């Protein structure tokens, strides 16, 4: 019997700066998908890293997490160790064999997620988008028309901008909450698949030292 490959699209919200080698995650969300369907989602809050008294959290974010903690579908873990165990079990229960994120060099290298996915095949969705859509004339025109450029003059490829392109909705604003972001990143990945083009696996976007293996899946 043929079994479709299951992918997990993962997003984390963390404390810490861009230069930190490890960032404590207070929110982890993931979506298990095949090429045809969404199988499952998980929404984890890590209490030991959720410092609601900190100025780091704006008023809107504090209200969001207060409400989230009351949601019965949310898994509340008191420590990162507990979150690792819960998340690893979810990956196993869903037979996940490949993990994906938009900017894997952060989510997969600087959070507790790295211990849950050790040895798994992975895709950087930002890299996949660059390989399949980001270099097309249509995407370049889209960025030109809307002013979506980096400081160095390159087309922006944040999850928010990529999702705006694949949905043709320039008003979309990314939530920057883990599960919601994983859902939009799953749709970006599906748009990459729809091109039927090869893209890179097991390498982070911008990690040019890694061997770039292009494959169709």
Locations of the language-model features?
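Short, glycine/acidic-enriched loop or turn micro-motifs at the edges of active sites
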Residues: 14-16, 127, 184
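Hydrophobic, well-ordered secondary-structure scaffolds
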Residues: 1-2, 12-21, 166-170, 191-196
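Acidic, Mg2+-coordinating catalytic module of metal-dependent nucleases/exonucleases
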Residues: 98-104, 109-110, 147-217
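Short, polar/flexible loop-turn hinges at active-site or ligand-entry regions and domain interfaces
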Residues: 71-74, 115-118, 169-174
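Generic enzyme active-site microenvironment
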Residues: 9-11, 122, 185
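Short alpha-helix plus adjacent loop in nuclease-associated cores
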Residues: 124-151
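Substrate-recognition/cap helix-loop segment adjacent to the acidic, metal-dependent catalytic center
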Residues: 105-126
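Conserved non-catalytic scaffold segment of RNase H-like nuclease domains
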Residues: 2-112
């Amino acid at each position: 019997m043929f079994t479709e490959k299951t992918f997990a699209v993962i997003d984390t919200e963390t404390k810490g700066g861009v230069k930190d080698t490890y960032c404590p995650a207070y929110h982890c969300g993931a979506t298990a998908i095949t090429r045809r369907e969404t199988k499952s989602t998980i929404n984890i809050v890590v209490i030991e890293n959720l410092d609601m008294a900190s100025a780091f959290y704006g008023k809107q974010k504090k209200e969001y997490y207060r409400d989230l903690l009351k949601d019965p579908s949310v898994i509340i873990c008191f420590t990162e160790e507990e979150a690792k165990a819960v998340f690893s079990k979810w990956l196993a229960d869903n037979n996940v064999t490949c993990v994906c994120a938009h900017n894997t060099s952060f989510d997969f290298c600087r959070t507790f997620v790295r211990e849950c996915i050790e040895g798994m095949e992975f895709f950087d969705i930002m890299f996949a988008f660059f390989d399949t859509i980001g270099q097309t004339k249509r995407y370049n025109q889209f960025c030109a028309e809307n002013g979506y450029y980096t400081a160095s003059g390159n087309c922006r490829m944040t999850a928010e901008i990529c999702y705006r392109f694949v949905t043709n909705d320039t008003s979309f604003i990314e939530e920057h909450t883990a599960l919601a972001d994983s859902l939009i990143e799953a749709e970006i990945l599906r748009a990459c698949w729809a091109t039927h083009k090869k893209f890179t696996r097991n390498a982070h976007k911008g990690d040019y030292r890694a061997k770039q293996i292009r494959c169709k899946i």
